[in-house]
């Protein structure tokens, strides 16, 4: 099979935006009953963020170094997260409607910023037209076989649901994806928005649709509409089944997330926030030192085809997890060290909105705070480090799609080489609170006597007789070394 993933994804820096919470434009008329922007988020309240607000902040994203946006759902819905879809062909009016998306796509593409949307195709909402028709017409509805109905009248609001729904939540009736009409409907959505100019789909809980043929056909239709479109699935477990070349290009790389949390967090994590996600998906994972982490991350690279590895969406938090800063009990040095790893490891890094300015938050809804646009509330050191790491990745092709090789993994120190052609970049990370002295074997990788420059701090080290000897690493710090020529 000729498996190819979009080249642009290999060089992407994603920025995940929760539309209700990122930015709002004064050009749109808003409902009166909105929560204040600055107040703590709630499960059901709206704050009024919209797509024109995002458009007005494209300068900010461009300055940060972002070249791809992943939006949480934007279609008409009766929930602030919009995973309860009413109409898949209409952008929610509160977000500015279809016209706002059209304008945003135009301006983003002018800046070479790609845009992918969240596709929720396993389930819809009680307000979805076809399901609502069943609520109104019962056994006489023309859409009975769009869902798995088990009794009448439907218990959509009271009592135990008598139809199949996601996580037994009556607000989320599951589609009958064995029905050809349902399949064709979903495929038409996928094609419609690709034709409208989006650059790909992030697929919500695609593992709930058990039929591989469904996603194979989905890929065929999307790639026919745009061969360069990106298809990325939300798969919080081993994704080999979906990454064989006939379904998805990549997945949200939660397997990497779990390892990053363990290695860089060490024994200093907030166990409640950490355990909320880990206990459900990676209870048996034990990473106690750099050796364990090296074996783990090398295994992830070997698990999938190389094309899929380059198209992974690598993240350390999202709308479904506590923010990593809060998992780390506010330790920003550990977060920045993890960021340096994320920006130098194979796969496309993804930043959850606000992480770059020090936004914190526990589990949902606190991980979905509104972005504070008063810069006095930002952490300038953190923002600067994010910008620097992004610039570093963009400036050095080896960090994006070069080969990866672990050179050192002992105790709390990890060192790995990224290489592409003549370019070789050595990354060394110290997660310890103590100064570390390490010797790294560089035999055959750089000439004897080569001078390597730290791209982060502009210091220099000299290779002697095949080794970088007595490399001194400050606590919770890293080096990115490249040979001077």
Residue ranges: model-predicted function:
Residues 1-117, 122-124, 129-133, 168, ...:
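N-terminal structural segment of carbohydrate-active enzymes
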Residues 6, 26, 30-34, 80-92, ...:
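Aromatic- and acidic-residue-enriched segments that line the glycan-binding/catalytic groove
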Residues 13-15, 69-71, 115-117, 201, ...:
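Hydrophobic faces of well-ordered beta-strands that scaffold small-molecule active sites
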Residues 17, 61, 71, 88, ...:
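Conserved, mostly hydrophobic/aromatic
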Residues 39-51, 84-97, 168-183, 200-209, ...:
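The substrate-binding groove and active-site-proximal loops of carbohydrate-active enzymes
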Residues 105-111, 123, 128-139, 188, ...:
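Active-site-proximal helices and loops of the catalytic beta/alpha 8
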Residues 407-445:
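Carbohydrate-binding surface patches
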Residues 464-485:
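C-terminal beta-strand-rich structural cap/linker in extracellular carbohydrate-active enzymes
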């Amino acid at each position: 099979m000729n498996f190819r993933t979009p080249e642009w994804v290999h060089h992407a820096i994603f920025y995940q935006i929760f539309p209700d919470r990122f930015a709002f434009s004064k050009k749109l008329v808003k409902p009166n009953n909105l929560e204040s922007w600055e107040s703590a988020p709630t499960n059901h309240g709206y704050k009024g963020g919209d797509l024109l607000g995002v458009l007005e902040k494209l300068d900010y994203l461009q300055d940060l170094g972002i070249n791809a946006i992943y939006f949480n759902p934007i279609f008409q819905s009766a929930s602030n997260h919009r995973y309860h879809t009413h109409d898949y062909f209409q952008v929610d009016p509160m977000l500015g409607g279809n016209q706002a998306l059209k304008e945003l796509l135009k301006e983003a593409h002018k800046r070479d910023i790609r845009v992918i949307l969240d596709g929720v195709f396993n389930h819809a909402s009680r307000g979805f037209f076809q399901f609502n028709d069943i609520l109104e017409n019962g056994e006489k509805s023309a859409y009975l076989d769009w869902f798995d109905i088990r009794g009448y009248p439907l218990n959509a609001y009271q009592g135990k649901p008598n139809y199949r729904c996601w996580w037994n939540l009556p607000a989320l009736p599951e589609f009958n994806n064995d029905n050809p009409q349902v399949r064709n409907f979903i495929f038409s959505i996928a094609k419609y928005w690709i034709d409208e100019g989006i650059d790909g789909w992030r697929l919500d809980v695609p593992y709930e649709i058990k039929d591989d043929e469904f996603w194979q056909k989905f890929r065929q239709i999307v790639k026919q509409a745009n061969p360069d479109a990106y298809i990325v699935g939300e798969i919080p477990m081993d994704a080999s089944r979906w990454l064989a070349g006939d379904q998805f290009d990549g997945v949200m790389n939660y397997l990497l997330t779990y390892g990053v949390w363990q290695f860089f967090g060490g024994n200093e994590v907030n166990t409640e926030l950490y355990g909320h996600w880990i206990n459900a998906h990676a209870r048996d994972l034990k990473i106690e030192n750099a050796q364990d982490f090296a074996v783990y991350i090398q295994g992830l690279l070997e698990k999938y085809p190389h094309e899929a590895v380059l198209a992974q969406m690598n993240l350390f938090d999202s709308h479904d997890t506590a923010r990593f800063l809060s998992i780390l009990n506010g330790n920003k040095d550990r977060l920045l060290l993890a960021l340096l790893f994320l920006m130098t490891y194979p796969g496309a890094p993804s930043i959850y909105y606000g992480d770059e300015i020090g936004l914190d938050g526990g589990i949902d809804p606190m991980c979905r705070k509104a972005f504070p646009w008063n810069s006095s509330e930002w952490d300038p050191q953190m923002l600067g480090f994010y910008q620097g790491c992004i610039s570093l990745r963009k400036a050095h092709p080896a960090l994006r799609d070069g080969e990866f090789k672990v050179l050192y993994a002992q105790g709390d120190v990890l060192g790995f080489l990224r290489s592409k052609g003549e370019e070789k970049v050595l990354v060394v990370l110290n997660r310890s609170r103590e100064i570390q002295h390490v010797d790294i074997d560089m035999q055959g990788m750089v000439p004897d006597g080569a001078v390597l420059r730290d791209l982060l701090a502009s210091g220099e080290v000299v290779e002697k007789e095949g080794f970088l000897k007595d490399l001194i690493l400050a606590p919770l710090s890293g080096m990115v070394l490249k040979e001077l020529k």
